[in-house]
Amino acid sequence: AASDVYKRQAQAFAQAGRPVQLAGFDIAKPAVRLAAKALPAAKYAVASSFAQPVRTGWADLLLNCFSPFAQEEFRRVLRPGGRMIYVVPGAEHLYQMKAVLYDTPYKNPVQEVAYEGFRPIGEREVSGSITVPAGQLEALFAMTPYYWKTPRDGAARLAALPELTTDIAFRFLVFEKE
């Protein structure tokens, strides 16, 4: 679904006489293969956010979803005045999943962020809920940091569920390179 959004946006820019180049990086080969199938017009590489295989000042816009903030590399890759959308979990993100995994579930910390060389220009939170069937719960769980620090009994409780309805919350933080 996200690839369709990127494809439509790229087409809209091209029709307006402003063609775009899209590139994506992930440290996971399966994620890169999946992205390349979904949006073949973009260029992809298995790479870390901390060492992106592009020239300095290449990007007008960076989108970083749930990955570490590679401040120096983002500053290098963005052109002056370029923008970055940094997507982080909101306070309630996957709260009901954590209630299954842990004896004492917790909300994600929501903190103000400041990054040298970047000026904050906007923020928006989007939230809702999803119902995840048993067949997809393990995949969702494996994409979270909880996968690596959850006690076995918590993971077993999650695996035993026929489905899980949980909150999702995303904070979109928008910055401009100074």
Where are these regions (language model features)?
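Short, small-residue-biased leader/transition segments that mark boundaries at the very start
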Residues: 1-6
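Class I SAM-dependent methyltransferase SAM/SAH-binding core
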Residues: 7-52
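Short alpha-helix immediately C-terminal to the canonical SAM-binding loop
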Residues: 32-33, 71, 94
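A short acidic, Gly/Pro-enriched loop at the edge of an enzyme's catalytic core
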Residues: 50-62
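Conserved beta-strand signature within the Rossmann-like core of class I S-adenosyl-L-methionine
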Residues: 81-93
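Conserved Class I S-adenosyl-L-methionine
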Residues: 98-120, 126-178
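Conserved S-adenosyl-L-methionine
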Residues: 118-128
